Amino acid sequence: MNEKIRNIAIIAHVDHGKTTLVDQLLRQSGVFRANEQVQDRVMDSGDIERERGITILSKNTSVNYNGFRINIVDTPGHADFGGEVERILKMVDGVLLLVDAFEGCMPQTRFVLRKALELGKTPVVVINKVDRPGARPYEVVDEVLNLFIELGANDDQLDFPIVYASARDGVSGYEPDELTHSMQPIFDTIIQHVPAPMGDENEPLQVLISTIDYDDYVGRIGIGKIERGVAVRNRSVVVCCADHEEHREARLSRLYRFEGLKRVEAETVGVGDIVALAGIPGISIGETVCAPTAVEPLPFVHIDEPTVSMDFIVNTSPFAGREGKYVTSRNIRDRLFKEVETNVAMRVETTASTDAFKVSGRGELHLSILIETMRRQGYEFAVSRPKVIMKRDEQGHLLEPIEELTVDVPQEYMGTVMENLGTRRAVLTNMINENQGSVRLVFDVPARGLMGFRSELLTETRGNGIMSHIFKDYEPYTGEIAERTRGSLIASETGEANSYGLFNTQERGRLFCRPGDPIYEGQIVGECSRNEDITVNVCKKKHVTNMRASGSDEALRLTPPLEFSLEQCLEFIRDDELVEVTPKSIRMRKRFLTKDQRIKEFNRIQAQGKEYDE
């Protein structure tokens, strides 16, 4: 047992300030030099993480405080990245539960806390943002206590210490109105209450790999906590897994420990510390690295199954290969299977077609982040509409995933939101009137019903609605849900959109393109005002004659086009439509590009339906 080490994960709902808190802990423990320029949210290292202000991958860091070494793991707050959180909990002995002093306990708080309590982790509660207008720290503490009781915490876990803080300003204290300009109360509480890691350094080595990193110089790096023994550089080890009998030998060519934000090479790393191991080819998450004298694999945490799937397809549009660097099915296949090695909550399967791969994940956000990442890496492909993964019980009844949805809205929009969710088969389970005229609504809603809801909520509440959801359980199928009530405007020829063609088309619906945009036959160029697909020609040019007429040369006034994000495109498309993704563009298109192909496919489906009825 190493008394001078503490391993802790920071868990919280999205946007409650985890990454900002880690920033302050690093600053105040002397990790950065006095003259060092440091960006905000230093733990969010990916471009997409910094742009969206969310954490996607959990990160490791370490601080030294009064002779103690505190290893900190910053975890994602979105339920879609819950697979990251679940396995990270295997590396730590305690959790720092961060709760917003205004918002209180949210669905993601419940999800991660349940996992932590089941694994017997010691909690420390930090009530953050106590300086926020409308903060209610004491009420939030009562909410946290009720949540602990509801989740079946034991007596030791219920006796949790509380620290109040404002991570943005770097202040903390044991009472909300007695804050000091330092993070010392948080450091002291961690050292006093979080147990030191168990294990005997005189026993043979045993490390469970919880995270994988990659380095161009040394290759794959396995990161995990040393459960017992000591890791020594250049020593032989055996890699094994609890799921199968196979063992393989390897040598630890390099060892790293975490100091601040850097990985530092070490000759030996002791029990209880978090270590990064290099030199083991093909190491993957869930494997155990042991000494050759005692090959004993450790069980890995159960990761919840994916709930949403979509097809990744080779791009077959007329513009294929113009903008992307990696466009073949082999490129896409290799990239997807590489993703699965580190993204434990994701699944990739081959399909009957060599050009399509079925990718399953925790939610729309989980999959759209992968699409955005691949796009930035130079990949070009098409994706289908996300579909919910159904199951059948022992009696053969159809089951579907149900999500617990929490919506915070101003009172005047409450009726509109409830009406919208009613059409999506949602059931209201709780309603809480909050201060400052807002209401918190809690629903049980099928995962199918959430597709496309986020953008509708923002429209209905004029940007004031906040939603978050979390997987609850599989329950009996709730019935059909009404889909998009409007059709698509489909380009009839390939060319360049121009003002004349767009002006004549805009009265039929809302447009997605502007003059000068390259267009191909079968591309979706707008949303029809009626519930049918209409073929339009936005490339049509005005015939030039040598006759002049008054009023014929007036300037054409065009309505500005709608610009969709990747998530909005995935929400908009129907089953017979695809989203084409390239490094420079995101376009929507029909699966069958020509009108003749679409009519043939429609007739084929109709004929199959008649045979089925007979």
Q: Which residue stretches match the model-derived regions?
A:
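A glycine-rich phosphate-binding loop feature that marks nucleotide/adenosyl-phosphate handling sites
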Residues: P161-R168, P204-D213, T350-G361, K387-D393, ...
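Charged, conformationally dynamic linker/hinge segments
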Residues: V295, I303-G437, R448
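P-loop NTPase switch module centered on the Walker A-proximal segment
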Residues: M1-V99, E103, E143, I212-D215
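Active-site phosphate-binding and catalytic loops of NTP-dependent enzymes
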Residues: V31-S58, F81, L147-D159, I191-L205, ...
